[in-house]
Curated annotation (Swiss-Prot):
Protein family (similarity comment): Belongs to the UPF0309 family.
InterPro entries, per database record: RpiR-like_SIS, SIS_dom, SIS_dom_sf, SIS_GmhA/DiaA_subfam, UPF0309
GO molecular function (one): carbohydrate derivative binding
Domain annotation SIS: ranges: 33-212
NCBIfam families the UniProt entry points to: PRK02947.1
GO BP term, pick one: carbohydrate derivative metabolic process
Descriptive protein name: UPF0309 protein ABC0887
Signal peptide span: none
Xref: SUPFAM superfamilies: SIS domain
Pfam families according to UniProt: SIS_2
Length: 246
């Protein structure tokens, strides 16, 4: 089997496992978020470095939910030089709390945090601070990976241990999936593809609930379709009390 075929098999297995074993937790995540929306609360997304790709993928995207508010830090994005700065800052205790407090978060809001290892302070701090503010914390992590490493946070806790709801991407420790002949290190990470599938699956389950309740489904149209800009502007105006990125 070629390396590409091995990767395809790994991704296919993980997606199937997510549906077969994780559909209940997908539904629970959707329940939490829909309840918050109905109560006029806000939804936030966070991830550091490559984990932040999931927040980017779900935010301000054609076919995506308009109510996701990302928490981005320029110092944790992949255009930083030197790139190793992202690793140093996500290990800096207190930084996650500062980032959360830069947003208008309030009791009853929901925070979705993606961290593959779940061991670094930026995600753990943010989760702890969010819970102290009365927010609900949903985490997406690699549970087996996280259990195999020690926390870098002074509490000794990992992300899955400080979250209200834990979602598992079912990946391997180290994230990469394909063994190659010339390396001891595996190649081809799985967390981004699986994470993207998970966040969009949550949105689909949310839409099912919103439709059943007769509520508007605030989803973006492509700005490159005729009428897309006007549609999106009107929708964002209707939901401006839950949108904090404009």
């Amino acid at each position: 089997m070629s390396y590409v075929e091995q990767y395809y098999e790994s991704i296919s297995r993980l997606l199937r496992q997510t549906v077969d074993e994780g559909e209940e937790v997908l539904g629970k995540a959707a329940d939490i978020m829909v309840h918050a929306i109905k109560e006029g609360k806000s939804l936030y997304l966070f991830g550091a470095s490559h984990a932040g790709i999931i927040a980017e993928d779900a935010f301000y995207r054609a076919g995506g939910l308009a109510l996701f508010n990302p928490i981005f830090s320029p110092a944790l994005m992949l255009n930083v030089e030197p790139i190793t700065l992202t690793s140093k800052l996500e290990r800096l205790e207190g930084y996650g709390t500062i980032l959360l407090e830069s947003k208008p978060v309030k009791q009853g809001d929901v925070l979705f945090i993606h961290s593959v290892s779940g061991r670094n302070p930026v995600a753990i701090d943010m989760a702890i601070a969010a819970k102290q503010k009365g927010m609900t914390v949903i985490s997406l992590t690699n549970v087996s990976y996280s259990k195999s490493v020690e926390s870098r946070h002074s509490s000794g806790k990992r992300l899955f241990e400080v979250s209200d709801l834990v979602m598992d991407n079912h990946g391997e420790p180290g994230d990469a999936a394909v063994s190659v002949k010339s390396l001891s290190q595996k190649v081809a990470p799985t967390s981004t593809i699986v994470g993207s599938f998970i966040i969009h699956s949550i949105v689909l389950k949310m839409i099912e609930q919103l439709e059943e309740a007769g509520r508007e489904v605030p989803v973006f149209r492509s700005a490159n379709l005729d009428g897309g800009d006007a549609y999106n502007e009107a929708m964002m105006e209707r939901h401006k009390h839950q949108i904090h990125y404009m």
